[in-house]
Regions:
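N-terminal helix-turn-helix DNA-binding core of bacterial DNA-binding proteins
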Residues: 29-69, 80, 96, 152
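N-terminal leader segment of winged-helix/HTH proteins
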Residues: 1-40
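DNA-binding alpha-helical recognition surfaces that contact promoter or target DNA
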Residues: 72
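Exposed, interaction-prone assembly regions rather than primary DNA-binding/catalytic cores
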Residues: 131-152
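A structural signal for well-ordered alpha-helices, especially hydrophobic packing surfaces
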Residues: 23, 27, 53, 141-144
Length: 152
């Protein structure tokens, strides 16, 4: 089905505005309905650290938080036993932040709660809606990768 260029342009603008809003809304709803004991920023940093250790400056850039803000956040995670500072094995002058086993367990608990909340709501969808949502996830994964990110 071909649509005219003005309508397509309008749809593209609406999608470009809607996607980040919807992603943010899902996150807000999750944190409002669950009691994880973590902030969104803490979960974001733990998720980043679950892939590899980071320098503070890298974390700040990745998460869109100031360097002093990330330092405070990492200090809180470290106090709770969820992150630790280590010497970078490639450059002994550099300190990196790494997730601990307790941090991984905490992150998995949060992710499990998030999945359970979404699963409960997705269960109420009909088969066609589930199939449409599954197709949308594949497209979102492709979009994330084209933007230089990792979908998973």
């Amino acid at each position: 089905m071909k649509i005219d260029s003005k309508k397509r342009s309008r749809q593209l603008d609406e999608l470009a505005a809607a996607l980040p809003q919807r992603a943010s809304a899902l996150t807000r709803i999750f944190f409002a309905r669950t009691h994880t004991g973590l902030s969104r920023a803490e979960v974001g940093v733990l998720a980043a650290l679950s892939s590899r250790p980071f320098r503070i400056t890298e974390l700040a850039a990745r998460e869109g938080i100031s360097q002093p803000g990330v330092t405070q956040l990492v200090n809180r995670l470290q106090q709770r036993g969820w992150a630790e500072r280590r010497t970078d094995p490639q450059d002994g002058r550099v300190v990196v932040v790494a997730i601990t086993d307790a941090g991984r367990e905490t992150l998995e608990r949060v992710r499990s709660e998030y999945r359970a909340l979404l699963h409960e709501e997705i269960t109420a969808l009909d088969d066609e809606q589930v199939a449409t949502l599954a197709s949308a996830v594949v497209i979102l994964d492709e979009l994330i990768e084209r933007l230089g990110g990792r979908a998973r």
